[in-house]
Amino acid sequence: MRRRPMTQQGLKGLFLVVFILASCSSPSDDGGSGGCGGSEASITCLNVTSIVPTSLGTDTTNVDALRDQCRDPVSGAVTGPEPFGDHNANVTLANTQFPTSTSTDRAFDIMIIGYSVTYTLNQGGCPAAARGCPPLTGFTTGQSIGIPAGQAVTVTLPFVPLSVKNQYVQAGGELGIAAPSYSATYTFTAQPIGVNDTFTLQGSSQFTITDFNNCGT
């Protein structure tokens, strides 16, 4: 039986299979999965290579949920409110060609066209001594982020913003030593520039949340 040559439509179908498989990886802690897109045989991939939570100029996974008043350690007099704000994360996204690509294949710049953040309580559940470990509602934003072909870009994004901290406190979250552990998962929607296809990729990182004392920082 004579074999039919692979047509342009066949190549496109092959690309779609690769595209679907590459876009369905699961997230992992302190980094994440990747996704790929492109045009027919030319495929470019985007990966979340690291997520580093940061607050008040320091890399930390300890999220302070409640703002306290700082006091003089000798007199006990109130000296002012402790430093407080959004807890962010430095997220690194790397744009690379598909592993089977050659040096002559076209490489695409990729644009993040939006992302969402969701929260889950980590394995082990709520500590027995905790007064509460409420579910946390995530958020979605249409922020655009460009990642040139062959390069990595690090951006500072909201990790646990003030709105989520307030939600945790108002819902009765633990504010003592029995701090619960959650994971924040970013789901990015990306598009190779000049191509109509979009794909998603994920990355997650764990954090502990309670009423941490940041006076003196």
Where are these regions (language model features)?
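C-terminal motif of bacterial Sec signal peptides marking the signal peptidase cleavage site
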Residues: 20-23
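Bacterial N-terminal signal peptides that target proteins for export
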Residues: 2-14
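Non-catalytic macromolecular-recognition regions in eukaryotic signaling proteins
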Residues: 25-217
